[in-house]
Amino acid sequence: MNTNDFDFELPEELIAQTPLEKRDSSKLLIIDHRQKTMVDSHFDHIIDQLNPGDALVMNNTRVLPARLYGEKPDTHGHVELLLLKNTQGDQWEVLAKPAKRLKVGSQVNFGDGRLKATIIDELEHGGRIVEFSYDGIFLEVLESLGEMPLPPYIHEKLKDAERYQTVYAKENGSAAAPTAGLHFTTDLLKKIEAKGVHLVYLTLHVGLGTFRPVSVDNLDEHDMHSEFYSLSEEAAQTLRDVKQAGGRVVAVGTTSIRTLETIGSKFQGDIQADSGWTNIFIKPGYQFKVVDAFSTNFHLPKSTLVMLVSAFAGRDFVLEAYRHAVDEKYRFFSFGDAMFVN
């Protein structure tokens, strides 16, 4: 299959620039790929799609205020660093601007020198490995100096940074939010749990590769970015019990899907506690091993995320659903509306 097979027309005005006032008031398009049905609904009705005994699996990663603005002490030139992932200790892979001025050994100061970065390796496409030095606790220093790294297609400033976090965000480490989870409120999750649905959490730290366009025509030539994931023994046991009792594993978002399917692929369909790095690329032809249904936002044309949804529900039907969403003025991308896929 080619990248262009996953293209569709998307009017720019449908790209949501701000979150809705209430998280769960977004629209929800419920699709069933076997029955070939589509139903327009609202997100707080997602509870009606969940059965007692099902497991709802969510990614509890937390977005770091990963964009830092500093200057070189020798030239006072302005520098921007975007933290991508913690490689070891105080070393991070970052995206640097302007990268060409930052050679190995270069230093950058942030916040009157409260945080310092030394370039220790140069990567391609403006990437660098830096080592930070600071007093105190790194995350506290970062909270005071860093800014939330909103996706490149969002041009308006976010009034409340917590609206780019899920209500259950816990594990620091992402450069972007797992946006399918932004629709849930604490109250809605309580109602879902009261219905007899198991709430299960895993972690996948979302990298900026999630926004990287597919630059090749042939999907087999695309290199997926790697992201760190973790599933605890308690969570794995709950999911095994749910499967054994005939319940469904319902994933919230593509990051939860990629984690569960990475583990399912690694353990021949079994669900085991595990952690590591995944670069799984789920595209049409992939056989799902763990996930039975999922919710997700509406994604960019020609993106790996549209390909993932198509792997589950079929490309033609997914593109038909996307055309319906465009016609019905659904809001797209991170702050947009959601889809529930049976």
UniProtKB/Swiss-Prot annotation:
Keyword entries, A-Z: Cytoplasm, Queuosine biosynthesis, S-adenosyl-L-methionine, Transferase
MF (Gene Ontology): S-adenosylmethionine:tRNA ribosyltransferase-isomerase activity
Subcellular location: Cytoplasm
GO cellular component terms given for this protein: cytoplasm
Keyword Signal appears in the UniProt entry: no
SUPFAM superfamilies from the UniProt entry: QueA-like
InterPro entries per UniProt: QueA (IPR003699), QueA_dom1 (IPR042118), QueA_dom2 (IPR042119), QueA_sf (IPR036100)
Pathways per UniProt: tRNA modification; tRNA-queuosine biosynthesis
Cystine pairs: none
Catalysis performed (reactions): 7-aminomethyl-7-carbaguanosine(34) in tRNA + S-adenosyl-L-methionine = epoxyqueuosine(34) in tRNA + adenine + L-methionine + 2 H(+)
Main location: cytoplasm
Gene Ontology biological process terms in this record: queuosine biosynthetic process; tRNA wobble guanine modification
Family of the protein in this entry: Belongs to the QueA family.
SUBUNIT field: Monomer.
Protein name: S-adenosylmethionine:tRNA ribosyltransferase-isomerase
Native species: Streptococcus pyogenes serotype M4 (strain MGAS10750)
